[in-house]
Amino acid sequence: MAAATALDSLPAPLRSLRLKTKQQELLLRVSALALIYVLAFVVRLFSVLRYESMIHEFDPYFNYRTTLFLSDHGFSEFWNWFDFESWYPLGRVVGGTLFPGLMVTAALLHRLLRALSLAVHIREVCVLTAPFFAANTTLVAYAFGREIWDSGAGLVAAALIAVCPGYISRSVAGSYDNEGVAIFALLLTFYLFVRAVNTGSLAWSLASAFGYFYMVSAWGGYVFIINLLPLYVLVLLVTGRYSQRLYVAYNSTYVLGMLLAMQIRFVGFQHVQSGEHMAAMGVFFLLQVFFFLDWVKYLLNDAKLFKSFLRITLTCVITVGTLALGIGTASGYISPWTGRFYSLLDPTYAKDHIPIIASVSEHQPTAWSSFMFDFHILLFLFPAGLYFCFKRLSDATIFIVMYGLTSMYFAGVMVRLILVAAPAVCLISAIAASATIKNLTTLIRTKSKSPQTVSGKSSGSKAAAKGAVDQSLPFQQNVAIALLLGAFYLLSRYAVHCTWVTSEAYSSPSIVLAARGHNGGRVIFDDYREAYYWLRQNTPSDAKIMSWWDYGYQITAMGNRTVIVDNNTWNNTHIATVGRAMSSYEDEAYEIMQSLDVNYVLVVFGGVTGYSSDDINKFLWMVRIGGGVFPVIKEPDYLVNGEYRVDKGAAPKMLNCLMYKLCYYRFGELTTEYGKPPGYDRVRGVEIGNKDIKLEYLEEAFTTSNWIVRIYKVKPPKNRS
């Protein structure tokens, strides 16, 4: 009464602002979503605040360079661009060998900002594209969670994915890679498809197809979608959940999505010819059979006759399908699975057959510690969420269960795919957290009712039982309060962990290195940019640079020089040739470099600073990749009793190969640690075995301040006498 009197005493304009319960809920929901949206964006800005606005890693530099070209020259020139500065002397057809979604998105955002009279450099747009789409992903996660469960689960899912380290790892500011927009497209496609299945709406189905098209344009991970959707449809068919809604949703999404995806030059006819896409086509035809059988069953209206017809139809379908698959494979129309696809099904395949795939760190199997590092408490909420989903089975919960289980399997096979599993883990964990909190709060709000006096023996016993329940209610409520406080504590620890991981682990650009000094202060190593600046200012504009493929994109984008190989890795033989040169004696390597018109050689060395991701640690992969094409290169020649060494006990070929000489040239004169002999390698923890290195065919051109990047000039051939 007092509250009502106080409200009535307010002025009329303020009294009109009183909201109904539903309006209050809507206001709180919108406010929470807005805060989550801002949080998702801001938490990814650590690298910009700590360093500066810059592009991270290796691949993003190619994406930035192509976006700059697109912004300056237009889409037509970009789509038909032949890049002479990469893969010399082969070059690269850029438009037909990339997924353009990321570049087009950033270019459109840049044009939009310019149209709004905001003078922003294209680099700043590229740096902030991933955080912007990560914030948008929280909105999709909310809508998806609400579609699967309820609005509470949607809000929790949005909050969890906003700070989930498994997603933040590839969406921080400066991480201008395909995954920055692809995870948004992935989740959007799944949400629209589930919405289409739930409603049977053609509009939602077509929207799902356009979401799939955006995913195809952005990242090769679209293969996960085009295989998960048919698997989901197949499960629904097997479990007797076929419906007209499912028929409309899948057929519309598949047909329109296929036609749109084929417009991407890098995909083209692979969508109807590649073995990786055949499952989707097979389920499409299977759905037509189901629709036909459903129609025949309605016409016949005779169970016995329909069973006979069903038996004949299934026999014909299986026979025709098997023949079509066999003939298509034998004739070469259906291409086999790619090496990356095989490596997902068999984790040992790449190591045994395609070492260049196995050499990439993000293609390695995932350690258990990585799951805990990237998911924290979600790793324990995930099984609980699966339990709640199975408890309330529907078409939507079946989909999220399948998405969660399949993505977690692939995340275990390849560490990079934790990124794909992150949205599923957040959604399923949100269901567990939301349902648990809702049950606990319902119990806490329950009011005890004293049993009424009733006549009769049976009524008396019921009242006694009810009284016993009411007497235990306070204890249950106390337990519920304790559990609720525990849940909020764990979620708060999750938030703290995510913030710490984002700040310390995922916000360090690999092009600028940082370490702690002896006094605890931060020491910055800016050697990469120093080396690329030197290349740009001190070498001829047509100079050809040979390095391991990891640094190709950065050299081209920042050094503005032609490279022999880069991160595209489309030509294994060309990369193997570079690996052979690095693994050979100097005179043999010189002949290879002359055949490739190499002017400078760039190597990365961490023996002075303790930087472990240097070329000496990558060298065995150069040997394996080179030996895979050129049998003259044999890995055992560089090992001693199966052990990789760089000290006095190292193999003779190791001590005299080009890579060893370029990394350790003049290093034997240098004292790196107090109390250690000259030539002490701080990464390997040993004194090098060959200190008296002489170069005959190359000469040192430049070494950065901390010796991390070393550049050598290839001497011109001597005149014939």
Swiss-Prot record:
Sequence motif WWDYG motif, residues: 548-552
Motif residue range(s): DXD motif 2: 177-179
Pfam families found in the cross-reference section: STT3, STT3-PglB_core
Name of the molecule in the record: Dolichyl-diphosphooligosaccharide--protein glycosyltransferase subunit STT3B
Organism encoding this protein: Oryza sativa subsp. japonica
TM annotation in the entry: 26-46, 130-148, 151-168, 180-199, 202-216, 222-238, 244-269, 278-297, 314-334, 368-390, 397-413, 418-439, 472-492
Keyword Cell inner membrane: no
Motif residue range(s): SVSE motif: 359-362
Lumenal-side positions: 47-129, 169-179, 217-221, 270-277, 335-367, 414-417, 493-721
Record: residues binding Mn(2+): D59, D177, E179
GO terms of biological process kind: protein glycosylation
Short motif DXD motif 1, span: 57-59
Ranges where the record places region Interacts with target acceptor peptide in protein substrate: 548-550
Bilayer topology annotation: Multi-pass membrane protein
Keyword match Ion transport: no
Position of sequence motif DK motif: 615-622
Residues with site note (Important for catalytic activity): R170
Cofactor: Mg(2+); Mn(2+)
Biological role: Catalytic subunit of the oligosaccharyl transferase (OST) complex that catalyzes the initial transfer of a defined glycan (Glc(3)Man(9)GlcNAc(2) in eukaryotes) from the lipid carrier dolichol-pyrophosphate to an asparagine residue within an Asn-X-Ser/Thr consensus motif in nascent polypeptide chains, the first step in protein N-glycosylation. N-glycosylation occurs cotranslationally and the complex associates with the Sec61 complex at the channel-forming translocon complex that mediates protein translocation across the endoplasmic reticulum (ER).
Main location: endoplasmic reticulum
Domain of life: Eukaryota
Catalyzed reactions per annotation: a di-trans,poly-cis-dolichyl diphosphooligosaccharide + L-asparaginyl-[protein] = N(4)-(oligosaccharide-(1->4)-N-acetyl-beta-D-glucosaminyl-(1->4)-N-acetyl-beta-D-glucosaminyl)-L-asparaginyl-[protein] + a di-trans,poly-cis-dolichyl diphosphate + H(+)
Chain ranges on the Cytoplasmic side, renumbered to this chain: 1-25, 149-150, 200-201, 239-243, 298-313, 391-396, 440-471
Domain free text: Despite low primary sequence conservation between eukaryotic catalytic subunits and bacterial and archaeal single subunit OSTs (ssOST), structural comparison revealed several common motifs at spatially equivalent positions, like the DXD motif 1 on the external loop 1 and the DXD motif 2 on the external loop 2 involved in binding of the metal ion cofactor and the carboxamide group of the acceptor asparagine, the conserved Glu residue of the TIXE/SVSE motif on the external loop 5 involved in catalysis, as well as the WWDYG and the DK/MI motifs in the globular domain that define the binding pocket for the +2 Ser/Thr of the acceptor sequon.
Pathway: Protein modification; protein glycosylation
UniProt-annotated binding residues for dolichyl diphosphooligosaccharide: R416, Y553
Quaternary assembly: Component of the oligosaccharyltransferase (OST) complex.
